[in-house]
Amino acid sequence: MLQPKRRKYRKEQKGRNTGVATRGSSVAFGDFGLKAVGRGRLTARQIESARRAMTRHIKRGGRIWIRIFPDKPISQKPAEVRMGNGKGNPEYYVAEIQPGKVLYEMDGVDEQLAREAFKLAAAKLPLQTTFVIRHLG
């Protein structure tokens, strides 16, 4: 699963996910892309699950790019622990997703196969997505 090799600080504040994606909002590597319409967080497990679904569907053909990386640690307190006594330990990592962000890209397959693969991947993700095609020029 994806996670940072090392961080300057182990824990991070919650923060607010506002605005729309300006960087990473167009298809750059492949011919087809899966773009976020909604806003939210994707865990490393969700990103990997969607990647596996796509990879299985396109079999050996094509190439997939993951355009997001889970670099934000989410901490949790253990079960049945009283409130207070500091912040919990980092349990998993998430990627903060803004509307307009391209999540995955695909190349080397026809459009119909790409649409099917992205549909399988989108079912694994907790946000609304749309299929986009690269426009040259």
Swiss-Prot record:
The lineage of its organism: Bacteria, Pseudomonadati, Pseudomonadota, Betaproteobacteria, Burkholderiales. Residues 1-13 have a biased composition (Basic residues). GO terms for cellular component: cytosolic large ribosomal subunit. Binds 23S rRNA and is also seen to make contacts with the A and possibly P site tRNAs. NCBIfam families: rplP_bact (TIGR01164). Belongs to the universal ribosomal protein uL16 family. It comes from Polynucleobacter asymbioticus (strain DSM 18221 / CIP 109841 / QLW-P1DMWA-1) (Polynucleobacter necessarius subsp. asymbioticus). Residues 1-22 are annotated as: Disordered. PROSITE patterns: RIBOSOMAL_L16_1. Part of the 50S ribosomal subunit. This is Large ribosomal subunit protein uL16. It holds the Pfam family Ribosomal_L16.
